[in-house]
Amino acid sequence: MSDKSNDGGENDSLPMDNININSIDDENNNDINNQDDNENNNNNNNNKNSDDNEENLKDYKNKKEDFGNIKMDTIDDRPTNNGILSPIDITSDGGDSVKTLSTTQSKKLDEGEKKEGEVGPQVPFFSLFRFAKPFDILLMIIGTIGALANGVSMPAISIVFGRLMNSFSPENLADPNFDLVETVTSNAMYFIYIGCGVFVCSYVEVAFWMLAGERQAVRCRKAYLKAILKQEIGWYDVTKSSELSTRISSDTLLFQEAIGEKIGNFLHHTSTFICGFIVGFVNGWQLTLVIFALTPLIAAAGAFMTKMMADLTKKGQDAYAKAGGVAEEKIGSIRTVSTFSGEPFEVKRYTERLKEALDIGTKKGIMNGIGIGLVFLVLFGTYSLSFWYGGKLIVDRKWNPVPDRPWQGGDVLTVFFSVIMGAMALGQASPNVASFANGRGAAFKIYEVVDRNSKIDPFSTEGRSIEETVQGNIEYRNIGFSYPSRPDVKIFNNFNLTIKKGTTVALVGDSGGGKSSVIGLLERFYDPDEGEVYLDGTNIKEINIHSLRRNIGLVSQEPVLFANSIAENIRYGNENATMDQIIEACKTANAHDFISALPEGYDTQVGEKGVQMSGGQKQRIAIARAMIKDPKILLLDEATSALDSQNELLVQQSIEKLMIGRTTIVIAHRLSTIQDADQIAVVKGGAIVEIGTHPELYALNGVYTQLVNRQQKGGDDGDKKKKKKSKESSKDESNNNIGPSSISIDKSIQSIGADSLETSTIGLVNDNDNKKKKKKEKKPQEKSVPIGRILKLSRGDWPHFLIGLVGATLNGAIMPVFSIIFSEILGIFQEQDTDELTRRSRNMALWFILLAVVAALANFIQIYCFTFIGEKLTFNLRRLSFESIMRQDIGWFDLTENSTGRLTANLATEATLVQGMTSQRLGLLIQNIVTIVAGLVIAFVSGWKLTLVVLACVPVIGFAGKVEMDFFQGFSQKGKEAYAECGQVASEAIGGIRTVSSFTCENKILEKFRQCLQKPIQMSFRKSNVSGLSFGFSQCTLFFIYTLTYWYGGKLVDSGEWPAKESTLETYCYNGEYANIGYTDEATCIKSFTTTEGFSMMMRVFFAIIMSAMGVGQSMAFMPDLGKAKLAAVAIFSLIDRVSEIDPFENKGQTLPEFKGDIEFKDIKFSYPSRPNKAVFQGFNLVIPHGKKVALVGNSGGGKSSVISLLERFYNPSQGSITIDGVNIKDLNLNWLRGNMGLVGQEPFLFSGTIFENIIYGKPDATMDEVVEAAKAANAHTFIESLPDAYHTQLGDKFTQLSGGQKQRVAIARAIIRNPKVLLLDEATSALDTVSEKVVQVALDNVSKGRTSIVIAHRLSTVIDADLIVVVKEGKVVELGTHETLLAENGFYAELVSRQM
């Protein structure tokens, strides 16, 4: 793995305070941009070595099925630096990773694909650090030293405890010169020294590893996006791009977790394990061997759990990948979903995709519970054996070689603590191993893309530069070509075409003939399988890819704009363009006037995928973008298709001027626009069947003549042949279109509600709502969500809660009970009577056995039950969130903060974060509460004075936790917003990859992505330092409390605070019995037993409080997650509580017994909510009689589409009413209303799935016969049947299997199948070729009979037979009548007609 893949150059200076935060970004231009330099040298020669990710897409079926509940989550508990003996904190780190699903027709599995039952592929562990720079390596080395040193602290404590206990031996206590207080104080000082070391080491461990991980993850994100952007378009055809953008967030997060502070935590506990056993063997190898014999059982239980959890987590990630794909697709196509009232079905479908994860989550809880239960069973069993055997060593007076004396109680304590803590540390390290496994699995998929040699690499510096030499001679020589997604279907076979420089060549022919493939090959979106494409005699493969594309200007049928200002979108064509150049280009494209009319002019944000612009406005911006490029070669794929006749004529003239002196390839269905071309090539079946000028071809009386004659017959009353300035736009691929690879916003109807100038601003919600939302997002932590409301969602799981509560309560009591047993053992080891020592040690061993069984059962019950509750809660939150998203009005989706990328990312993460309040954390919280209460009760009963002194220190620990929690709350929100913005940049770039490639703006996208990462980079420094300091402070505080406890406890023992039991004194001290056990007088004997009893009680208080403090500490460790959970809960419930003005889930409103279709717009006043002062309609009135065909005509931006928008109730008018059959549509049931309307938009949006499933989306219960009948009516049946899988052909998420015309016909079939009472046709035939258009138009005319039809048209020839033609201008009806009457008036309509003559 080459170091070139690393990106970033560092300011390698220490200390950390001098770190240059911006250094990471300075690296970007060097390493990220050079990451693939060596790879680029072989890109064109290693095509066969490039494996595309492929996976079969699942069909969405069984629409009426009820689905189960589900949720997978990440358990990410941060282990604390444990006290003496902490409960094992073994939890599995999972993740909401998103797996890339890819469309495939070849049915191959990706080389890294996991077979059933196998562990997913992973990279070697050290490969995780491929993005590390020297400074990161230095940080990791220092962090490693700190972690290893931190791990030594607990074994060191065991030595101190052993020494302290041995100081209480009968020999010392019998010595009159023995100073108890001084002895205890001197030993307690060691805790101060260790505590100071722990503070420094904890800070270094956490801060350095966290910072190093964040820095490397930033580079990984940048490298991953760059690798995605460098792939050839064919790779996108077989890779589901709707999940690629999510993977940038999810997989890189798993990657970051595997290289951050979890490594420090793992090294810390590994060090404790090793040092613990070293101390054990040095201080007593016999007992150590006995304990060590059982240690592998603990490791085996941990390994078993880790493997099972990793495998189940991988499966859960796959399940969520499918759910994420559904959510992104449906949110991005919300207008299509709303049109067909598909919201309830989509909620069910989303739930269905989570069904598999329900079983996985349940199994995960079971396996986790079994694994941890086994660990505790073995652990307490080891305690039992240890103390029994330790007592035996003391009784038998076995010789301990290192201190060179018989075994004493302190030796047992030292060995026991050190070895057990070492074993426990091994268990605590195991969750990190699961994180490493998840990170290595995520890295495999990331590296798979990063290391893939793109067949056509846009970042390659190889090849000739042609900027100064290009002339424009183009030759296609013996081309053979098939699309990667359909290698079995030949597009070209020995295709040949020569285009001379400075000439215009038009490609014409029926849809699906292969015209757009010509452009795709010239742009090098694809390379031919056979033959070559030449530019000025040079094979284009030998030309630098950026140099080639910089000299080509492409304007396609479906323009893609990015969520930026108009000026920035145009600047994609020329990064160095001045504002004057941008304005000039817009004037040429006839866009300047409408842009200048906007309040913010060229700084107006266009919205995601240009959603705020009408179709015509988007097209003009796209033309300006191409013009400012000043290309030597122009590729026009129906470049004026979305313009009205007035704008089309002006822009066409501008384009014709631009074409002068340039080589131009024009794809056209409308032959009147290309009759002046130097050459016209008729493409049919992937071959050129005729070529020549218009007169030459027309004289042949062949295919071209037939095409011309068909269009003349369909002209304006049979008038002249130049009358068709229409909106026929098409992608003519037989199985691919060269438009955007994955248009995630709703293309079929996105222009509806955006046709007027009033739509050209971001956000279509009312100002008050917007202000509230912004206020809420600024400081979401100020608003709290009652925990009761969250738990209320789990009220159906109360049996699990009650059972889990019992388990958590038992679990919480275990460690306080352990403190009692342990303090008794300390007294036992000071027992002088060997028979009594043997008996009591055997009894304590049995107590430990009982404790082991209870701990195993309690842990299983607690973990399983609360995991189950958490899974169900997160399912409910995800379902409710998605349902709330689906119920929102269309304007809500137009807000930038509600973009597809952000909503899907939040949907995937916020519900998981809320689980921080429930699931295992809730169980642990209950357990800790019981531990705290029980520990305090025991402590107060055993010694209230010492307890009060120690409790006075607890607020200090609480303060440290509060500081950390407050910090994480602020960071969580800021980091979330920053990464959401980064995700949106990536999502847009991937979704519009063909536009990104065509305009060579990959580096611009990367720079924008880098800028988005600036904030997380800067915050990472503060985050790592505050985390390290607060963690170190909270841990060292424990050691200072140890010091205070022992010092004050020693004073209390010395003062006789805990007198010995009277029965003990009667047995061993009174009546001369003291002599039998070696004491010289009764007073010394009494003092010795009183001191021993006092020491035992002091340790009981100490351990009880430590257990409580550890409970507090562990709860504090949850504070960052709790802070994130609170923020996420606020966001989720804000979404769930939002009342939609137009709610598709409301089953209220009346339905009419008979739907006739009389429609009336009465005194309509309407402004888009974001522009209340700019009226679209002011007193708009229109009556549409039932059964009539009404055409809306006029210039682009006049408000025509707003009529359909209001009728579909995408928006509500601010004043006036819209009635159907005399009933206000607000009073009608929304789904019933939309169910009686069929809408076909200009730009069709289909869903991933089969053609059959797309058609029945209009009528879910349709039969196959109905589907076929609808397809026949839309002239789609024949081409569908010609496909290998016919109606079961998978479309994927980019629909590359269909041409633009074919997509439109499927969309028309989808509308026809519902047998609507009202037809809404917004240029429904615009994407069809002449033959298909004519047939479909006849079909639409037939189905329109007896129905109310509203047709929006720029091409007037399609509406001359309308019963009523309505001329809409600036939001007003200026003329009304039939074609003949309006012509006779010689008004605005007559002017429109004359323009098209």
From Swiss-Prot:
It comes from the Eukaryota. The keyword Transmembrane applies. It holds the Pfam family ABC_membrane. ATP binds at residues 509-516, 1194-1201. One of its GO terms (molecular function) is ABC-type transporter activity. Residues 474-710, 1159-1395 form the ABC transporter domain. The chain crosses the membrane at residues 137-157, 191-211, 273-293, 369-389, 407-427, 801-821, 846-866, 922-942, 948-968, 1028-1048, 1101-1121. Residues 24-39 have a biased composition (Acidic residues). Residues 37-69 form a coiled coil. Residues 735-744 have a biased composition (Low complexity). Residues 140-438, 801-1124 form the ABC transmembrane type-1 domain. This is ABC transporter B family member 2. One of its GO terms (cellular component) is membrane. It is found in: Membrane. Residues 49-79, 107-117 have a biased composition (Basic and acidic residues). InterPro entries: AAA+_ATPase (IPR003593), ABC1_TM_dom (IPR011527), ABC1_TM_sf (IPR036640), ABC_transporter-like_ATP-bd (IPR003439), ABC_transporter-like_CS (IPR017871), P-loop_NTPase (IPR027417), Type_1_exporter (IPR039421). The gene is abcB2. Belongs to the ABC transporter superfamily. ABCB family. Multidrug resistance exporter (TC 3.A.1.201) subfamily. It is a multi-pass membrane protein. Keywords: ATP-binding, Coiled coil, Membrane, Nucleotide-binding, Repeat, Transmembrane, Transmembrane helix, Transport.
